From Swiss-Prot:
PROSITE patterns: COMPLEX1_30K. This is NAD(P)H-quinone oxidoreductase subunit J, chloroplastic. Keywords: Chloroplast, Membrane, NAD, NADP, Plastid, Plastoquinone, Quinone, Thylakoid, Translocase, Transport. NDH is composed of at least 16 different subunits, 5 of which are encoded in the nucleus. It is a peripheral membrane protein. It comes from Lactuca sativa. InterPro entries: NADH_DH_suC, NADH_quin_OxRdtase_su_C/D-like, NADH_UbQ_OxRdtase_30kDa_su, NADH_UbQ_OxRdtase_CS. GO terms for cellular component: chloroplast thylakoid membrane. Its EC number is 7.1.1.-. Pfam families: Complex1_30kDa. It is found in: Plastid, Chloroplast thylakoid membrane.
Length: 158
């Protein structure tokens, strides 16, 4: 089943894949990493001016990594804002996705957290570095194949 936004993207020749609807009726679309930045700009111009959240997850051990964006279209006088969920999948060996920081500035810390926990590199992000783990941390703690170290020494702050 194709939703309103998916039909609009098809009409304008923008490549994507419809993943259906979630339990709240929000349309979910898959966008290829190479197309994501240009489609993000188009969605912003189309009215999806609010990035509600961004997160990432490990799809399966040894499989793809996913970056998920929840966008909202807020219009004056509209009874209900339109929402869409965008999923961008990246290969585990070199997970690179274009950053949308220059489209939605609120994604700054969220993309940094996804980088820190899963190792997804967001190209053209102005400050892509660890945000939760120490800079010296090795590995990506939320990957399903991550092996936690037996010991990690926290240095004294003095």
């Amino acid at each position: 089943m194709q939703g309103h936004l998916s039909a609009w993207l098809v009409k304008h020749g923008l490549i994507h894949r419809s993943l259906g609807f979630d339990y709240q009726g929000i349309e979910t679309l898959q966008i290829k990493p190479g197309d994501w930045h240009s489609i993000a700009v188009i969605l912003y111009v189309y009215g999806y001016n609010y990035l509600r959240s961004q997160c990432a997850y490990d799809v399966a051990p040894g499989g793809l990594l996913a970056s998920v964006y929840h966008l909202t279209r807020i219009e004056y006088g509209a009874d209900q804002p339109e929402e869409v969920c965008i999923k961008v999948f990246a290969p585990r060996r070199d997970p690179r996705i274009p950053s949308v920081f220059w489209v939605w500035k609120s994604v700054d810390f969220q993309e940094r957290e996804s980088y820190d926990m899963l190792g997804i590199s967001y190209d053209n992000h102005p400050r892509l570095k660890r945000i939760l783990m120490p800079e010296s941390w090795i590995g990506w703690p939320l990957r399903k194949d991550y092996i936690a170290p037996n010991f990690y020494e926290i240095q004294d702050a003095h």
